[in-house]
Every structure is written in C-alpha cells, then in structure tokens.
C-alpha cells in the first residue's frame, strides 16, 4: 500500500521518546489496522532517535521525517503537515496527535465525524484534563489569568 491508499494520515511529533511513540503506534494499529498512515516527525532526537522499525513492529505503514536539530513541537508538526500537504488526496483526512500518550487514538473517529458536517474543514479537540503536577497546574492557572488580564481573552485549552 502507498500513502494514497490510506484514509487517515496521522502526523505526530516525537522527541527522545521512542517508548511512548511505540505505544501510540501499537494503539493506532489495534484500532485502525491498515487504514492509518503515520508521518512521525523526529524533532532532532540525539539519544534515542525514532526509526522505521517502530512503525513496522506495530504493523503500520508510514514515514519518519528525521530533523537535524530540535525545532520545537509546533514547528515539527508544521513540517509534518507540509509533507502531507504535498501528497494528500481528497478522500484522506489528517489527524495531528502528540506521541506522549496524552492524545488517545480512540477519539479519532469522533473527530473525523465532525468533518462530515458541511462547511467544516477543521475539528479541534479540547482536552478534558491534563496529567500534570500540582505545581504545573498552579503556575499554568496563574499564566492563564495573567494572559486574560493583559489581552482580554481567555485561554480555553491546555
């Protein structure tokens, strides 16, 4: 099968976390079998770079885009989306997922269902809860309040 033969393309950034991304790949394979093509963007991992074996061992087709240096989570996603944009066909859908275990493959069908509505091009998930330390939650709440005071806008995600 080739890129065009898959109905769903998953773009995921990975940085020094082969273990978590391998779990994601296994979950994707179990849930979607041959319908998923993975574009994993290794964001400059030095100690433990991702390789194609991680996908193959999970029974998935895909590519690993190896970046020479760490460019950050958002830029790695943008690079993955750029790769997809040059190859995507009208029947395919793209899902962006973190590879750290926070985003669950079981939510993909619900997201894709949202794209079936007319005039909808993008569906965004809102995380119901984070798995973070109390210290992180406290400082993030302070940041969100400060952001709201300075801009007049609330951050409703994260």
Where are these regions (language model features)?
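Active-site-proximal specificity loops/subdomain of glycosyltransferases
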Residues: 51, 59-77, 87
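Cell-envelope/extracellular polymer assembly enzymes that use nucleotide-activated donors
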Residues: 7-9, 37
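Alpha-helix termini
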Residues: 32-33, 57-59, 83-92
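Acceptor/aglycone-binding surface of glycosyltransferases and processive sugar-polymer synthases
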Residues: 68-69, 73-83, 93-96, 105-158
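Short, well-formed alpha-helical segments that are part of the catalytic scaffolds
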Residues: 16-30, 48
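Short beta-strand/turn micro-motifs composed of small residues
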Residues: 12-14, 42
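A conserved acidic beta->alpha catalytic loop
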Residues: 42-52, 101-102
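Short beta-strand/loop segment that forms part of the nucleotide-sugar
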Residues: 35-45, 65-66
